[in-house]
UniProtKB/Swiss-Prot annotation:
Protein name: Tryptophan synthase alpha chain
Protein source organism: Gracilaria tenuistipitata var. liui
Pathway per the UniProt entry: Amino-acid biosynthesis; L-tryptophan biosynthesis; L-tryptophan from chorismate: step 5/5
Highest rank taxon of the organism: Eukaryota
Subunit comment: Tetramer of two alpha and two beta chains.
Length: 268
């Protein structure tokens, strides 16, 4: 039932690399090939984002990718088709990243059932109201999907404890206020927040928003983080006119991130 948490726990002290890409971007064929490249080059888990027109938590790079995918007609139906085609060829479990409105429009029960049948193992809904969590959790448990809840830098201690009490096993810690995108460094209070979660709960932590280079990874590894999410920086490597050049660039970048995690983990 908690496939993502169980997977991360099996890695013991090793931090997981979790790349994010937008489903259907820049087109379905390259998206499928990109997922296979990420899997081959060391991704431990992969986040696949469902394109959405009002993606408030996403920065300009991911928003542009979503808009481009939507213009090509990439909606939930097409995302399910991508999952069905590619998951049998992947080792890395897939986590679906979507906003709540598309889930409601599709029908919550239907949506969670469909992503489960397509082979996804996890679900992230960044704008999910805390009041709705119990209902979503019930359906996720029914269909063996792990729901991963968000903790923001502005979350109070009482809210963190409430989120942790509802979380099946893994918390997504947002590295900064605002939207996703490329950043140079992280506020030390994020480290304190991560330490707080680790010391007061038994939950694992995925850290995301703004991670894009080896120096940041070296910093984050020392925070006892269980998984590092890289999104905008990944998407910048699948922009261009020559598909093979894009995939080669993506492979090189993913390999570099994986090496950085491995190296930083060994010197902790």
């Amino acid at each position: 039932m908690n496939a993502i948490t169980n997977f991360l726990r099996k890695k013991n002290s090793s931090c997981a690399l979790i790349p994010f890409i937008t489903a259907g971007y820049p087109n379905i064929d390259i998206c499928i090939k990109a997922l296979k490249v990420l899997d081959r080059e060391g991704a431990d888990l992969i986040e696949l984002g469902i394109p959405y027109s009002d993606a408030l938590a996403d920065g300009p790079i991911i928003q542009e990718a979503s808009q481009a995918a939507l213009k090509q007609g990439i909606y939930i139906e097409q995302v399910l088709s991508i999952l069905t085609k590619v998951i049998p060829d992947l080792h890395a479990p897939i986590i679906i990243f979507t906003y709540y409105n598309p889930v409601l429009v599709r029908g919550v029960d239907k949506f969670i059932c469909e992503i489960s049948q397509a082979g996804a193992k996890g679900l992230i809904i960044p704008d999910l109201p805390l009041e709705e969590v119990d209902y979503i959790l019930e359906l996720c448990n029914l269909y063996s999907i792990e729901l991963i809840l968000f903790v923001a830098p502005t979350s109070s201690q009482s809210r963190i404890q409430l989120i942790a009490s509802k979380s099946p096993g893994c918390i997504y810690l947002v590295s900064s206020c605002g939207v996703t995108g490329l950043r140079d460094n992280f506020d030390v209070k994020i480290q304190h927040l991560a330490n707080n979660i680790k010391s007061t709960t038994n939950k694992l932590i995925m850290l995301g928003f703004g991670i894009n280079n080896p120096d940041q990874i070296s910093q984050i590894i020392n925070w006892n983080i269980d998984g590092i999410v890289v999104g905008s920086a990944i998407i910048t490597h699948i922009v261009g006119e020559l598909p093979q050049d894009m995939l080669n660039s993506l492979a090189h970048f993913c390999k570099k991130l994986k090496y950085s995690i491995h190296t930083a983990s060994n010197v902790k």
